[in-house]
Protein backbone atom coordinates (compact mmCIF):
# COMPACT_ATOMS: atom_id res chain seq x y z
CA UNK A 1 0.00 0.00 0.00
CA UNK A 2 1.00 3.59 -0.48
CA UNK A 3 -0.04 5.49 2.64
CA UNK A 4 -0.30 9.05 3.81
CA UNK A 5 0.33 9.20 7.55
CA UNK A 6 -1.60 11.92 9.32
CA UNK A 7 -0.53 11.24 12.91
CA UNK A 8 1.26 8.77 15.10
CA UNK A 9 2.00 8.22 18.74
CA UNK A 10 3.46 5.54 20.96
CA UNK A 11 0.54 3.14 20.38
CA UNK A 12 -0.95 3.85 16.96
CA UNK A 13 -0.47 5.26 13.50
CA UNK A 14 -3.31 6.99 11.67
CA UNK A 15 -3.32 7.49 7.96
CA UNK A 16 -5.04 7.14 4.64
CA UNK A 17 -4.47 4.48 1.99
CA UNK A 18 -3.67 6.29 -1.25
CA UNK A 19 -3.04 3.31 -3.50
CA UNK A 20 -3.03 -0.47 -3.35
CA UNK A 21 0.13 -1.56 -5.10
CA UNK A 22 -0.01 -5.34 -4.71
CA UNK A 23 -3.21 -7.28 -5.21
CA UNK A 24 -3.46 -10.95 -4.39
CA UNK A 25 -6.15 -13.46 -5.16
CA UNK A 26 -8.07 -15.13 -2.37
CA UNK A 27 -6.69 -18.65 -2.22
CA UNK A 28 -8.02 -19.48 1.23
CA UNK A 29 -10.55 -21.96 -0.18
CA UNK A 30 -8.00 -23.89 -2.25
CA UNK A 31 -6.53 -26.68 -0.19
CA UNK A 32 -3.23 -28.47 -0.52
CA UNK A 33 -2.77 -31.68 1.45
CA UNK A 34 0.59 -33.42 1.37
CA UNK A 35 1.61 -36.81 2.76
CA UNK A 36 5.33 -37.16 3.39
CA UNK A 37 7.09 -40.33 4.46
CA UNK A 38 9.00 -39.90 7.71
CA UNK A 39 12.52 -38.71 6.87
CA UNK A 40 15.60 -40.27 8.42
CA UNK A 41 16.43 -37.17 10.51
CA UNK A 42 14.30 -34.77 12.56
CA UNK A 43 16.06 -31.80 11.02
CA UNK A 44 14.56 -32.81 7.65
CA UNK A 45 11.06 -32.99 9.14
CA UNK A 46 11.59 -29.52 10.62
CA UNK A 47 12.75 -28.15 7.25
CA UNK A 48 9.75 -29.68 5.48
CA UNK A 49 7.29 -28.20 7.99
CA UNK A 50 8.97 -24.80 7.87
CA UNK A 51 8.96 -24.52 4.10
CA UNK A 52 5.51 -26.04 3.53
CA UNK A 53 4.10 -23.61 6.12
CA UNK A 54 5.70 -20.70 4.26
CA UNK A 55 4.11 -21.96 1.04
CA UNK A 56 0.69 -22.12 2.75
CA UNK A 57 0.11 -25.86 2.62
CA UNK A 58 -3.09 -26.65 4.53
CA UNK A 59 -2.38 -30.12 5.88
CA UNK A 60 0.91 -31.99 6.30
CA UNK A 61 0.81 -35.68 7.18
CA UNK A 62 3.91 -37.63 8.09
CA UNK A 63 3.66 -41.39 7.83
CA UNK A 64 6.11 -44.21 8.43
CA UNK A 65 7.07 -46.08 5.30
CA UNK A 66 8.77 -49.43 5.07
CA UNK A 67 12.14 -47.69 4.69
CA UNK A 68 11.61 -44.94 7.27
CA UNK A 69 14.24 -44.73 9.98
CA UNK A 70 12.00 -42.63 12.22
CA UNK A 71 8.79 -44.54 12.89
CA UNK A 72 7.08 -42.39 15.54
CA UNK A 73 7.16 -39.05 17.32
CA UNK A 74 6.21 -37.69 20.71
CA UNK A 75 4.41 -34.58 21.96
CA UNK A 76 7.65 -32.66 22.43
CA UNK A 77 8.57 -33.18 18.75
CA UNK A 78 5.04 -32.21 17.67
CA UNK A 79 5.19 -29.02 19.76
CA UNK A 80 8.54 -28.14 18.16
CA UNK A 81 7.06 -28.61 14.68
CA UNK A 82 4.08 -26.43 15.65
CA UNK A 83 6.43 -23.66 16.81
CA UNK A 84 8.45 -23.87 13.59
CA UNK A 85 5.23 -23.76 11.59
CA UNK A 86 3.92 -20.72 13.45
CA UNK A 87 7.15 -18.80 12.90
CA UNK A 88 7.10 -19.68 9.20
CA UNK A 89 3.46 -18.65 8.81
CA UNK A 90 4.16 -15.31 10.50
CA UNK A 91 7.21 -14.74 8.30
CA UNK A 92 5.21 -15.47 5.14
CA UNK A 93 2.34 -13.19 6.20
CA UNK A 94 -0.25 -15.93 6.15
CA UNK A 95 -2.96 -16.30 8.77
CA UNK A 96 -3.58 -20.03 8.94
CA UNK A 97 -1.42 -22.69 10.57
CA UNK A 98 -1.31 -25.97 8.67
CA UNK A 99 -2.61 -29.09 10.31
CA UNK A 100 0.43 -31.25 11.11
CA UNK A 101 -0.10 -34.90 11.98
CA UNK A 102 1.78 -38.14 12.28
CA UNK A 103 -0.42 -40.98 11.03
CA UNK A 104 0.36 -44.67 11.17
CA UNK A 105 -2.84 -45.50 9.30
CA UNK A 106 -3.00 -43.29 6.23
CA UNK A 107 -6.27 -44.70 4.84
CA UNK A 108 -8.68 -42.32 6.66
CA UNK A 109 -6.70 -39.35 5.33
CA UNK A 110 -6.89 -40.65 1.77
CA UNK A 111 -10.64 -41.29 1.69
CA UNK A 112 -12.64 -39.24 -0.81
CA UNK A 113 -9.53 -37.69 -2.31
CA UNK A 114 -7.76 -38.19 -5.59
CA UNK A 115 -4.30 -39.52 -4.78
CA UNK A 116 -1.33 -38.33 -6.78
CA UNK A 117 1.99 -39.96 -5.93
CA UNK A 118 5.16 -38.08 -6.70
CA UNK A 119 7.64 -40.69 -7.90
CA UNK A 120 10.46 -41.16 -10.37
CA UNK A 121 8.93 -44.00 -12.40
CA UNK A 122 6.68 -41.82 -14.53
CA UNK A 123 7.53 -38.71 -16.50
CA UNK A 124 4.18 -36.95 -16.38
CA UNK A 125 4.40 -33.36 -15.27
CA UNK A 126 2.25 -31.77 -12.59
CA UNK A 127 -1.27 -31.37 -13.93
CA UNK A 128 -3.16 -28.14 -13.62
CA UNK A 129 -5.42 -28.58 -10.62
CA UNK A 130 -9.09 -27.87 -10.35
CA UNK A 131 -9.28 -25.53 -7.38
CA UNK A 132 -12.24 -27.48 -5.99
CA UNK A 133 -10.70 -30.93 -6.37
CA UNK A 134 -9.89 -32.99 -3.29
CA UNK A 135 -6.37 -33.98 -4.21
CA UNK A 136 -3.80 -35.30 -1.80
CA UNK A 137 -0.16 -35.31 -2.90
CA UNK A 138 2.17 -38.04 -1.69
CA UNK A 139 5.95 -37.60 -1.65
CA UNK A 140 8.23 -40.62 -1.66
CA UNK A 141 10.31 -41.76 1.30
CA UNK A 142 14.07 -41.70 1.20
CA UNK A 143 15.31 -44.49 -1.07
CA UNK A 144 11.96 -44.42 -2.93
CA UNK A 145 8.82 -46.47 -2.50
CA UNK A 146 9.11 -50.21 -2.15
CA UNK A 147 6.88 -52.67 -3.95
CA UNK A 148 5.16 -53.27 -0.61
CA UNK A 149 4.40 -49.52 -0.33
CA UNK A 150 2.69 -49.63 -3.72
CA UNK A 151 0.73 -52.80 -2.92
CA UNK A 152 -0.35 -51.83 0.58
CA UNK A 153 -1.00 -48.13 0.37
CA UNK A 154 -1.81 -46.92 -3.11
CA UNK A 155 -4.58 -48.63 -5.01
CA UNK A 156 -6.14 -45.73 -6.93
CA UNK A 157 -3.41 -43.27 -7.70
CA UNK A 158 -1.70 -41.37 -10.48
CA UNK A 159 2.09 -41.09 -10.70
CA UNK A 160 3.64 -37.70 -11.35
CA UNK A 161 7.24 -36.59 -11.83
CA UNK A 162 9.02 -33.25 -11.77
CA UNK A 163 11.27 -34.49 -14.56
CA UNK A 164 14.63 -36.18 -14.81
CA UNK A 165 16.21 -34.49 -11.80
CA UNK A 166 16.57 -36.76 -8.78
CA UNK A 167 15.52 -34.68 -5.79
CA UNK A 168 15.83 -35.39 -2.10
CA UNK A 169 12.46 -36.04 -0.52
CA UNK A 170 12.53 -32.78 1.45
CA UNK A 171 13.43 -30.80 -1.69
CA UNK A 172 10.69 -32.55 -3.66
CA UNK A 173 8.15 -31.70 -0.95
CA UNK A 174 9.08 -28.03 -1.13
CA UNK A 175 9.26 -27.79 -4.94
CA UNK A 176 6.02 -29.65 -5.37
CA UNK A 177 4.11 -27.59 -2.80
CA UNK A 178 5.38 -24.35 -4.32
CA UNK A 179 4.38 -25.49 -7.83
CA UNK A 180 0.93 -26.49 -6.62
CA UNK A 181 0.29 -23.31 -4.70
CA UNK A 182 1.25 -21.21 -7.70
CA UNK A 183 -0.92 -23.28 -10.06
CA UNK A 184 -3.93 -22.53 -7.82
CA UNK A 185 -3.53 -18.76 -7.97
List where the protein language model places each region.
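N-terminal positively charged helical leader segments and presequences
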Residues: 1-24
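Active-site/ligand-binding-proximal alpha/beta "capping" segment
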Residues: 115-151, 156-162
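Active-site beta-loop-alpha junctions enriched in small/polar residues
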Residues: 39, 121, 165
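A short acidic, often aromatic-flanked loop/helix-cap motif at beta-alpha or helix-coil junctions
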Residues: 104-111, 123-126, 166-167
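Short, ordered loop/turn segments at secondary-structure junctions
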Residues: 20, 64-68, 164
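Structured adenosyl-cofactor binding patch, chiefly the S-adenosyl-L-methionine
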Residues: 147-185
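RNA substrate-binding interface of SAM-dependent RNA methyltransferases
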Residues: 25-114
